[in-house]
């Protein structure tokens, strides 16, 4: 996993790096715009939604949500990413913090209609993902959703095939989602495949839950 200084150094070229990978339809960012677009459209179905973005980066998605009337909260590991994102949404509540250690205190005091994470939670181990998702679910409003856009696969076999095809480009420090395995802990998890290596996972909190 990148440390904070490495994340800060990557911040300046992040959007460019993503664009090259997506245009070439290559791992890891094939389908990137469609992933973000799917999450954006889902959030827009609820007017004036309260949204928490985990790993907001340069604010590509978060700023669009902000511009369209959402109340935005966010946490990112990189101080430089926060500096780049904050001017795009001056009234948003953005914090620096390592979410492998959980949410920063001010974010724990809120409930959200949507908690979104795009290409960020793969920095957690599988065990950390399970624990973190359970915590996040408790911070949803009734009827709320966790929306995760990331490198993700329906099966372990599909992941291994992508690893083989990617060769030296594969990042062994990142831990990607395998839906069939995650569903053992979260049977109501939904998955929309976007590209051969990406998709949107959604996990809700029932309207009757309080």
Task: Give residue spans per PLM region.
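A short glycine-rich, Lys/Arg-flanked "PGG" loop and its adjoining helix->strand segment in the class I
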Residues: 130-142
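Short catalytic micro-motifs in class I SAM-dependent methyltransferases
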Residues: 119-120
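A conserved beta-strand element that flanks and buttresses the S-adenosyl-L-methionine
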Residues: 116
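Conserved class I S-adenosyl-L-methionine
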Residues: 48-55
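Class I (Rossmann-like) S-adenosyl-L-methionine-dependent methyltransferase catalytic domain
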Residues: 1-43, 58-106, 147-210
């Amino acid at each position: 996993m990148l440390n904070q200084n490495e994340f800060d150094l990557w911040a300046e070229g992040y959007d460019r790096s993503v664009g090259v990978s997506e245009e070439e339809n290559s791992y890891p960012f094939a389908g990137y715009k469609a992933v973000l677009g799917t999450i954006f459209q889902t959030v827009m179905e609820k007017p004036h939604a309260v949204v928490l973005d985990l790993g907001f980066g340069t604010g590509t998605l978060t700023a669009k949500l902000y511009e369209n009337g959402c109340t935005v909260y966010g946490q990112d590991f990189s101080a430089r990413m926060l500096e780049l994102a904050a001017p795009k949404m001056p009234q948003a509540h953005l914090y620096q913090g390592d979410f492998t250690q959980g949410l920063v205190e001010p974010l724990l005091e809120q409930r959200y209609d949507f908690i979104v994470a795009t290409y960020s939670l793969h920095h957690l181990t599988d065990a950390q993902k399970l624990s973190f998702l359970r915590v996040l679910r408790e911070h949803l409003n009734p009827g709320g959703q966790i929306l995760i856009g990331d490198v993700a696969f329906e099966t372990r076999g599909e992941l291994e095939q992508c690893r083989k095809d990617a060769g030296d480009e594969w990042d062994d420090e990142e831990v990607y989602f395998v839906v069939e395995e995650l569903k053992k802990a979260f049977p109501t998890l939904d998955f929309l495949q976007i590209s051969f290596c990406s998709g949107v996972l959604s996990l809700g909190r029932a309207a009757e839950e309080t």
